[in-house]
């Protein structure tokens, strides 16, 4: 859904995040007549780094839950379609709310972002913050929950912190219209109902109560760990797996040259 048609076509081997990508790639090869590639269930090293950093970071007790709004930057994202009614529902409800736009949104649509900030410059509730410094990601993983649309940040938050998210069902980010020709449903669709709750952009009434219920539901942690185990291959040792594959391939090439 995100990768353009042919994006992986010219690789001989692909280190996959998990088995779920195998069937997607195999169906794509057959659909477009591409040669079959070698697929290795490797894992997701960047996610492991984020997880290790999170585990090493001390967490302090806080008086009010932190809610992070972290949208994507595709058309009809949260900032362009529904940020005002969303904030209207959240502010004054006992949360500290931070709006953290995607860096690309600020880069491409700085005037829009400035207009949003300006609309709230006289707000005195003390529970609304705008984060426009993207040099770090501490605020993401220090949050109690994340509200997003189709940003990958939401899934990183879920898999790293083992906490649920709120997904706003804005129009999805579709870079590849051919995705519907593949029978495997995109992971971006299937995980939304499993690791949090979904809400319509025009239906935020009661969202504050839903968030409080999410934060009190301890079953999500175990559920998310199980999903991570099933979805992400070799969690905690992807570097070892990927490195061993490369070493083995080099040995094969060296041996072939000696023949």
PLM ranges: what are they?
Residues 40, 44-119, 201-204, 215-216, ...:
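Conserved catalytic-core segment of nucleotide-activated headgroup transferases in glycan assembly
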Residues 111-155, 160:
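Donor nucleotide-activated moiety binding/catalytic core segment of transferases
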Residues 1-52:
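Active-site and donor-binding regions of nucleotide-sugar-utilizing enzymes
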Residues 235-259:
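C-terminal alpha-helical cap of glycosyltransferases
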Residues 7, 60, 139-140:
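Structural alpha-helical scaffold elements that stabilize or flank donor/cofactor-binding regions
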Residues 17, 42, 100, 168-170:
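Generic beta-sheet signal
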Residues 12, 65, 141-144:
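Conserved acidic residues
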Residues 8, 36, 145, 150-231:
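Catalytic binding pocket for nucleotide-activated donors in carbohydrate/polymer assembly enzymes
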């Amino acid at each position: 859904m995100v990768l353009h048609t042919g994006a992986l076509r010219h690789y001989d081997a692909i280190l996959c995040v998990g088995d779920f990508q195998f069937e997607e790639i195999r169906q794509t090869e057959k659909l477009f007549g591409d040669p079959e590639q070698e697929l290795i269930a490797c894992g997701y090293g960047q996610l492991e780094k984020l997880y290790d950093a999170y585990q090493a970071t001390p967490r302090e007790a806080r008086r009010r839950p932190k809610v992070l709004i972290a949208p994507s930057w595709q058309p009809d994202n949260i900032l362009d379609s529904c940020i005002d009614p969303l904030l209207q529902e959240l502010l004054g409800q006992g949360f500290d709310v931070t709006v953290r736009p995607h860096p690309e949104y600020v880069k491409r649509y700085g005037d829009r972002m400035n207009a949003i900030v300006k609309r709230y410059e006289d707000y005195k509730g003390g529970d609304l913050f705008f984060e426009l410094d993207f040099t770090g990601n501490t605020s993401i993983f220090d949050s109690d929950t994340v509200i997003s649309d189709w940003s990958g940040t939401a899934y990183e938050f879920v898999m790293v912190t083992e906490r649920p998210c709120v997904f706003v069902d804005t129009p999805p980010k579709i870079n590849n219209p051919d995705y519907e020709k593949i029978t495997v449903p995109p992971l971006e669709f299937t995980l939304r109902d499993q690791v949090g709750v979904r809400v319509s952009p025009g239906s935020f009434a009661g969202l504050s109560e839903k968030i409080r219920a999410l934060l009190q539901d301890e079953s999500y942690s175990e559920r998310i760990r199980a999903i991570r185990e099933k979805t992400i291959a070799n969690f905690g040792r992807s570097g070892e797996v990927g490195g061993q594959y490369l070493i083995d391939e080099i040995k094969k090439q060296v041996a072939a040259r000696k023949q």
